[in-house]
Swiss-Prot record:
The gene is queF. GO terms for molecular function: preQ1 synthase activity. Its EC number is 1.7.1.13. The lineage of its organism: Bacteria, Pseudomonadati, Campylobacterota, Epsilonproteobacteria, Campylobacterales. Catalyzes the NADPH-dependent reduction of 7-cyano-7-deazaguanine (preQ0) to 7-aminomethyl-7-deazaguanine (preQ1). This is NADPH-dependent 7-cyano-7-deazaguanine reductase. The active site is at 50 (thioimide intermediate), 57 (proton donor). It holds the Pfam family QueF. Its main location: cytoplasm.
Length: 148
């Protein structure tokens, strides 16, 4: 049995769920845990709802991480991010929840989430949050200072 055989979404017909669901996230074993690649994932079609007005909010989500023993399966990540479609939450809360869900799933060495949301009322909101294990705290602090 290969590690990929445990993945539910990859290669299967896709049922789209449009209400937040962290159970959609899946991981597979890191084939090179001795290396430290900085992996960037970009979702250009992120949508959630304003919790006050119920109007749709649109943005681009950037996720960067250095894996430890597990890596996120990209189709499951797409389905997870799409599950925010009818979820009412502020931009900052969405970004924080994405980080917490991925940290829980992956237990990475380092992980950051940045949201570049379309401006509303002339104000663009661009939240950034990051996480690191003890050995990567200096990297975390540098990334936080360098965040756009």
């Amino acid at each position: 049995m290969t590690p990929e055989s445990n993945l539910k979404s990859l290669g299967a017909k896709t049922p789209y769920i449009f209400e937040y669901n962290s159970d959609l996230l899946e991981a597979f074993p890191n084939p090179n845990p001795n290396l430290d690649p900085l992996i960037t994932l970009e979702c250009k079609e992120f949508t959630s709802l304003c919790p006050i007005t119920s109007q749709p909010d649109f943005g681009v989500i950037f996720i960067r991480y250095i894996p430890k023993d597990k890596m996120v399966e990209s189709k499951s990540l797409k389905l997870y991010l799409f599950s925010y479609r009818n979820h009412g939450s502020f931009h900052e809360s969405c970004i924080n929840t994405i980080l917490l869900d991925l940290v829980q799933l992956l237990e990475p060495k380092y992980l950051e989430v940045y949201g570049d949301f379309v401006s509303r009322g002339g104000i663009a909101i661009k939240p950034f949050v990051n996480y690191a294990i003890k050995e990567y705290q200096d990297f975390k602090e540098k990334r936080l200072l360098d965040a756009k």
